[in-house]
Amino acid sequence: MKNITDSFVSLGHWPSAGSFGFNTDILATNLINLSVVLGVLIFFGKGVLSDLLDNRKQRILDTIRNSEKLREGAIEQLEKARARLRKVEIEADQFRTNGYSEIEREKLNLINSTYKTLEQLENYKNETIHFEQQRTINQVRQRVFQQALQGALGTLNSCLTNELHLRTINANLGMFGAIKEITD
């Protein structure tokens, strides 16, 4: 632990011009920060992500099954409508002289309304699937971010002891004193 503390203290000193030292510019160390964050996200979020995706997949499959049941109901309605259509066609042959155009109009309206119902059910199924996918993606993103943040905070809290904290503060105070002397 003392070696780790000494390495932090030695990294805390401002290097002279042209030498190697700790870079505190967050924009210059962005690649390192990104790799650390990605590593933490992958390490802590892998299991949770797979569980969430499996749960979401099951829900989506259930939604698809429900949509298929609705579709089967619509097909059943379509068959009933076709049976009714056949009946109407038989009656049309009998009453052709009394209103052929009226019966034909009834037939077209029945077919159109059935197809519209089928289209609406298909659109509803597709919208439901898309909505569930988007909601799942958003939930997974939020959960992974929360767990990565909790893991990072836990790691920081477990690594930062009082002794290390005091040494870091003293080293920073020493640096600020040296900077103040240079600027005065």
Curated annotation (Swiss-Prot):
Molecular function GO terms recorded: proton-transporting ATP synthase activity, rotational mechanism
Keyword Transcription on entry: no
Membrane topology: Single-pass membrane protein
Keyword Phosphoprotein: no
Domain of life of the native organism: Eukaryota
Subunit architecture: F-type ATPases have 2 components, F(1) - the catalytic core - and F(0) - the membrane proton channel. F(1) has five subunits: alpha(3), beta(3), gamma(1), delta(1), epsilon(1). F(0) has four main subunits: a(1), b(1), b'(1) and c(10-14). The alpha and beta chains form an alternating ring which encloses part of the gamma chain. F(1) is attached to F(0) by a central stalk formed by the gamma and epsilon chains, while a peripheral stalk is formed by the delta, b and b' chains.
Name of the featured protein: ATP synthase subunit b, chloroplastic
UniProt gene name: atpF
